[in-house]
Amino acid sequence: MIDAHDLASWMIDLAERRLTGVYNATGPDYPLSIGRVLEESKAESGSDAVLNWVPAEFLEQQALQAWQDLPAWVPDVGEYRGFFRVDCRRTVAAGLTCRPLRDTIRETREWAATFTPDHEWRAGLSRARERAALAAWHARQGRP
């Protein structure tokens, strides 16, 4: 995951320095899991949300597709194995810097707050589909 501000700033810097080449601009120079993003999001927002970690097989049973229904997530199996493990050292050496994750989260939350609470996002699951998937998961786990 990379903050668009960081990417844009770096690209302008490259142009000003007349640097060209192939770069993997995928995020910070450390491993960043979706779990960490979600935990940091909870902490930044003060949310008491409960994260439900479910196996990829369950998502498939619910007809939830990697990347389509769940943006920024793919199972680490088969054709997707290693999908998010991209070496970006060359990019960092060329000057890419990434702001702290919590800054990106805070700015994204501020932007999202400009929409009405009932706004239906075009990316990701609808509220109804999310509720149905969670209900199925909780039923499978014997929880209400």
Tell what function each PLM region has.
Residues 1-7, 100:
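A conserved structural motif in NAD(P)-dependent oxidoreductases
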Residues 13-79, 87-89, 106-109, 116-144:
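Mid/C-terminal beta-alpha module of Rossmann-like enzyme folds, strongest
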Residues 92-96:
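Short, well-ordered beta-strand elements within core beta-sheets of diverse protein domains
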Residues 97, 101-103, 111-116:
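Acyl-CoA thioester-binding alpha/beta core of soluble enzymes
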